[in-house]
UniProtKB/Swiss-Prot annotation:
Reactions mediated catalytically: tRNA(Ile) + L-isoleucine + ATP = L-isoleucyl-tRNA(Ile) + AMP + diphosphate
Binding site for ATP: K613
CDD domains found in the cross-reference section: Anticodon_Ia_Ile_BEm (cd07960), IleRS_core (cd00818)
Keywords for this protein: Aminoacyl-tRNA synthetase, ATP-binding, Cytoplasm, Ligase, Metal-binding, Nucleotide-binding, Protein biosynthesis, Zinc
Residue positions binding Zn(2+): C928, C931, C948, C951
The record's note on its domains: IleRS has two distinct active sites: one for aminoacylation and one for editing. The misactivated valine is translocated from the active site to the editing site, which sterically excludes the correctly activated isoleucine. The single editing site contains two valyl binding pockets, one specific for each substrate (Val-AMP or Val-tRNA(Ile)).
Lineage: Bacteria, Bacillati, Cyanobacteriota, Cyanophyceae, Oscillatoriophycideae
Protein EC: 6.1.1.5
Entry protein name: Isoleucine--tRNA ligase
Length: 959
């Protein structure tokens, strides 16, 4: 007896060298080298046919390693840029770095021994700081490139370069000449820990700050004209009650502020905690304050707030008289007493009241946060350490303290040193926002904000903000180009002095301020008086540095444009870079520096917690890409999985990441890759030039698939156009898994493997596969750039395009759209799902192994659908187009449309829905050795007795 014939070599199995495993650690750098060697980005950014597109980079700080926030931010930018490149835009992306400022200065100082610090001149410190910033910038650039980010890495912008600094001086100069820059004694956020003024954007408000809050009474010594009659009976024992969370500011008290729209009451209190039998408080607060003071307060008289204006009180700690004055709407009954202790040297609102009434500015605190001699008995005490205790004790002794309690609230901390700040009045340079606030608010309305609530965030910030303190008392920064008259202390700041400094900085950089003499730094007309001047020692706020990038980069570089198309940063930048850029641009040019502003949230761990070393929950992007020390626990996923994560999240709010999420994304990545591999493998012998089947000749299944491809890639395009990348993620995942793997490719295997290689049955399927793989590669390219390029390099046929990125965006045809076809195939897919349920029941009972072991019975009550299905169920396998058949759609050897439910109920296994009732019985005939389908014709062919009629025809080229 002879061995049965083997048909293994007659089956068209997939062939491709496209690896199932990404091997990203090795492969991704190879693909990045391919892009670099072929200058793909450079050529596209110059030669693309559409207009220039500029996403202007918000500069990360050149300090420390890259973290997940960097990864989210830079990848989002790169997704947009790569999409725009594929759409034919000349994308010009110049990465930038913020290089000045305190954090770098502190890092440098911390790295030095105390002996080294002793002889440290500003110039030496600046050289060390520059070296540190440049080294960090190089390391960060390497990391960004490994993420797959494209840009002009050879010519980044750094805020420390001469050309940048000179352009920034230009912005400062134009603002100064318009009268927007002034010097003044004003309370500013002051950091005693770093001994400099801070901008709002340099503050953070950690949870859990507890202050010592006090209620105190100041003795009334003279009633105002309007209250004489009412207050006279109580005067000798009357105090005005105030509340404060900063007792240390009491030495600076110069007024008490009230709300003119509130009513106030004189109340009697009968405890002996303080010297005053009678107190003035807001009438609405009497009940609450009775509870707080733990004593009954009895109302003796009420009076309108306005009437109390100019009532005189004595300071409880000094022999100093002050007045009760009208404050603003910040005086409320939400907390406190309805009367606010006012120290114009220690608060913005207090300062405004002081200005209105011509009060002085008393701020008896030095740069380290210690009281000066002006505070008399408290001189030398530190306001954040021991001052509160001493002041509270003295108030107690004087009989002024009503109550002390702990108060938990948000309090500003220095974002770098993580230590509390204070309000302190100092001589500083300011940008007067008042002069261009309305123009800024108008400019905000011209911008597209994504998400839309971004506009609601930045608008009140700009409309409510105080003047911008732009000076810093540090060495590592761009010097404010001002000279002071030695005798009068008057600043010298003119168009000529600014222009002269700008020219010097453009050539030599800002070190020249320290290196050159005053005479050399002054223009000709002032040189003779050089001996009368000294240089200023203040540097500019780093937010003025980065906020000038529109001028130093977007406007200055000829290949870019201003305003930029888009700015994209974290939501904290509404009070940071978005705002500083807006203010400088509006001040100088009366326009916003951007057309669109897109913001993203922060990266949290899987449980929604902030990442911190102390919690041990930090996810390192480098570990995601290259793996950790223990590669079993922290496998190397490569940059594409990281990029896929970025596309998967709704970045408009805070986004989680962790091991479980990465594992899930890795699985999805693998599914997309395996789908691509199947497509490539089944195109190994396909040449689109000669083997493509025309649309008219395609079977209905293939035409339906082209309709789905049109739907899918229209949705993907819209997702990118609207920056909703999570829609791209969901659509592509669904397309690869549900439309392709679980449906079309599942059905296609029979056509691809067992048909004659040249048959239209196979070539029509390959036509669809080629369209699917090319469009899939292009569609994933903005996100999974490495996988997309890898796919393109393994296309088994020639294309005119060297790279997926030079091939342009997805291409579909209007001809493929067919909504009627789509509706009828939605029903067929519903039937297929129901059949799968019934087959699964049979499989569980071990009645069948493969679905090909089954014959499927279908009962379809809807007449139209039944008629449609009948045309998909030819009498035998060799009539029809060999594709549009129910048996192939449901992966069974035979299908019978039955006339009654009884046949279904008599079947071994059944499943029912409104659409269809399904029965499963054993397939008829014998199993074909070649295609594994059952057929009653197996055994009829003398030369090939073990195969079916389809395979017999396929072997001679007829199927």
């Amino acid at each position: 007896m002879t061995d049965p014939k083997s048909y293994k070599d007659t089956v068209n199995l997939p062939k491709t060298n496209f690896s199932m495993r990404a091997n990203a650690v090795k492969r991704e750098p190879e693909l990045q080298k391919f892009w670099a060697d072929n200058q793909i980005y450079e050529k596209l950014s110059q030669e693309n046919p559409e207009e220039v597109f500029v996403l202007h980079d918000g500069p990360p700080y050149a300090n420390g390693s890259l973290h997940m926030g960097h990864a989210l931010n830079k990848t989002l930018k790169d997704i947009i840029n790569k999409y725009k490149l594929l759409r034919g835009y000349k994308v010009r992306y110049v990465p930038g770095w913020d290089c000045h400022g305190l954090p770098i200065e502190l890092k440098v100082l911390q790295s030095m021994k105390s002996k080294e610090r002793e002889g440290l001149t500003p110039l030496k410190l600046r050289h060390k700081a520059r070296d540190f910033a440049l080294k960090t910038q190089e390391e960060q650039a390497k990391g960004f490139k490994r993420f797959g980010v494209w840009g002009d890495w050879e010519n980044p912008y750094l805020t420390l370069t001469p050309e940048y600094e000179a352009a920034q001086i230009g912005v400062f100069g134009e603002m100064a000449l318009k009268g927007y820059i002034y010097r003044g004694l004003k309370p500013v956020h002051w950091s005693p820990s770093s001994q400099t003024a801070l901008a709002e954007a340099e503050l953070e408000y950690p949870e859990g700050h507890t202050s010592r809050s006090i209620f105190a009474a100041f003795p009334i010594i003279k009633a105002s004209k309007d209250t004489e009659e009412i207050l006279q009976p109580f005067l000798n024992k009357l105090g005005v009650a105030i509340w404060t969370t900063t007792p240390w500011t009491l030495p600076g008290n110069l007024a008490v502020a009230l709300n003119p729209d509130l009513n106030y009451a004189v109340v009697e209190q009968n405890s002996d905690v303080c010297n005053y039998q009678y107190l003035i408080v807001a009438a609405d607060l009497v009940e609450r304050l009775s509870t707080t003071f733990e004593t009954e307060l009895t109302v003796k008289a009420t009076l309108p707030g306005k009437a109390l204006e100019h009532t005189i009180y004595r300071h409880p700690l000094y022999d100093r008289e002050s007045e009760i004055l009208i404050g603003g709407d910040y005086v409320t009954t939400e907390s406190g007493t309805g009367l606010v202790h006012t120290a114009p040297g220690h608060g913005q609102e207090d300062y405004m009241v002081g200005q209105r009434y011509g009060l002085g500015i008393l701020s008896p605190v030095d740069a380290k946060g210690n009281f000066t001699e002006e505070a008399r008995q408290f001189a030398g005490l530190n306001v954040l350490k021991d001052a509160n205790e001493v002041i509270i004790n003295e108030l107690k002794e004087k009989g002024s303290l009503l109550k002390e309690e702990a108060y938990q609230h948000k309090y500003p901390y220095d974002w770098r040193t993580k230590k509390p700040t204070i309000f302190r009045a100092t001589e500083q340079w300011f940008a007067s926002v008042k002069g261009f606030r309305d123009a800024a608010l108008t400019a905000i309305k011209t911008v597209q904000w994504i998400p839309a609530q971004g506009e609601n965030r930045i608008t009140p910030m700009v409309s409510d903000r105080s003047d911008w303190c732009i000076s810093r008392q540090r060495s590592w920064g761009l010097p404010i180009p001002v000279f002071y008259d030695e005798e009068t202390n008057e600043p010298l700041l003119t168009e000529e002095t600014i222009k002269h400094i700008q020219t010097i900085f453009a050539e030599k950089g800002s070190d020249a301020w320290w290196e050159m003499s005053i005479e050399a730094l002054l223009p000709d007309q002032y040189k003779a008086d050089a001996h009368k001047y000294r240089k200023g020692t203040d540097t500019m706020d780093v937010w003025f540095d980065s906020g000038s990038s529109w001028a130093s980069v977007a406007k200055q570089r000829p290949e870019l444009k201003y305003p930029a198309d888009i700015y994209l940063e974290g939501s904290d930048q509404h009070r940071g870079w978005f705002q500083s850029s807006l203010l400088t641009s509006v001040a100088v040019n009366e326009i916003a520096p951007y057309k669109t502003v897109l913001t993203h949230g922060f990266v949290l761990d899987e449980k929604g917690h902030k990442m911190s070393k102390s919690l041990g929950n930090i996810v390192d992007p480098n570990v995601i890409i290259n793996g950790g020390k223990n590669q079993k626990q922290e496998p190397p996923y490569g940059a594409d999985v990281l990029r896929l994560w970025v596309s998967s999240v709704d970045y408009s709010s805070d986004v989680p990441i962790g091991k479980t999420i990465l594992k899930q994304l890795s699985d999805i990545y693998r599914k997309i890759r395996n789908t691509a591999r199947f497509l490539l493998g089944n195109l190994h012998d396909f040449d689109p030039k000669k083997d493509t089947v025309s649309y008219e000749e395609l079977p209905e299944l293939d035409r339906y698939m082209l309709h789905r491809i049109t739907e899918v890639f229209t949705e993907v395009t819209d997702a990118f156009e609207t920056y909703q990348f999570f829609r791209f993620f969901q659509t592509v995942q669904n397309f690869c898994v549900v439309d392709l793997s679980n449906f079309y490719l599942d059905i296609a295997k029979d056509r691809l493997y067992i048909s004659h290689p040249e048959s239209i049955r196979r070539r029509s399927c390959q036509t669809v596969l080629a369209i699917a793989i090319e469009n899939l590669a292009k569609a994933i390219a903005p996100v999974l750039c490495h996988m997309a390029e890898d796919i393109w390099q393994f296309l088994p046929y020639e294309t005119p395009y060297k790279s997926v990125f030079t091939a342009g965006w997805v291409k579909t045809s209007k001809q493929w759209e067919n909504s009627e076809l789509s509706a009828s195939w939605a029903k067929i897919r519903g039937i297929r799902n129901e059949v799968n349920n019934a087959l699964e029941l049979a499989r569980k009972e071990k009645a069948i192994g493969s679905s090909l072991d089954a014959k499927v019975l279908l009962y379809v009550p809807e007449q139209n659908l039944r008629q449609q299905l009948e045309k998909f169920n030819p009498a035998d396998s060799l009539t029809g187009n060999h594709v549009d058949e129910l048996r192939y759609f449901v992966l069974a050897s035979q299908v019978e449309l039955v006339d009654s439910l009884d046949s279904i109920k008599n079947a071994d296994y059944h499943s029912e829905s409104d659409l269809v009732s399904v029965g499963v019985i054993k397939a008829e005939g014998e199993k074909c050795d070649r295609c594994w389908n059952y057929s009653t014709k197996v055994g009829e062919f003398k030369d090939d007795p073990t195969i079916c009629e389809r395979c017999n025809a396929a072997l001679v080229g007829d199927f």
